[in-house]
Amino acid sequence: MKARLRFNKMGSMMYIGHLDLMRYFQKLFRRCGLDVSYSKGFNPHQIMSFASPLGLGLTSIGEYLDLSLESFDYNGFDSEKSGKASYTADEWIDIINANSNGLVNVTGFRIMPDDIKPSMSLLSAATYRVEFEQTDIPGQIYDFFNENDELIYTKETKKSKKDIDLKANIPVIETSYELFAREMSSCAVFDYEYEKQYINDD
């Protein structure tokens, strides 16, 4: 049984890297009693994968996690929960969030078809929001982006150098002074389109 979870990663959890976040979920699911499938072999581990590892220092309101489940049954040590044969997806969301730290919250839980592709291969892009203390910076970035046909970045490795056109990978950039008014700061918004199939709950 395959499941797809959508979750937020906020606050000080921005300083937790991808591997530590994976370990966090492994312990969280064990604590919740979620009946997760394990790999076979000498060192079995929970079968899960992320759509796109989030960079260190970033928060997110829309991360995706693919998970293999044996069942929707409770598989833990709480005798009261063990009395119920199975839980719904919404009930599991409540159970997971109740056992989380308040900075990582599951906002969506859906059972997927067995032949569904991993979310990593379905996700085509993401939306980033950048905030600035100086209100004139977003406008400068917007003008610079639109005035140049290319934005070349030279990526250097130990063996070679490679020029990459950053603009080709940023379909839209816009500034907003109203959308995030509660933040009391202006920002630059990098808009992308998500792959619609099975990615969003909408």
What are the functions of these language-model segments?
Residues 28-35:
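Secondary-structure boundary elements
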Residues 3-8, 67, 124-132:
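Short glycine-/aliphatic-rich beta-strand segments at the starts of folded cytosolic domains
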Residues 78, 83-202:
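An aromatic-glycine-centered, glycine-rich loop/turn in mixed alpha/beta architecture
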Residues 1, 32, 44-46, 61-65, ...:
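A generic structural signal for short beta-strands and their flanking turns/coil linkers
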Residues 6-12, 16-20, 31:
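Extended, well-folded interaction surfaces typified by the phenylalanyl-tRNA synthetase beta subunit core
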Residues 36-71, 113-115:
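Short, charge-patterned binding micro-sites
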Residues 15, 57-58, 119-121:
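Short, solvent-exposed beta-strand/turn "edge" segments of beta-rich domains on protein surfaces
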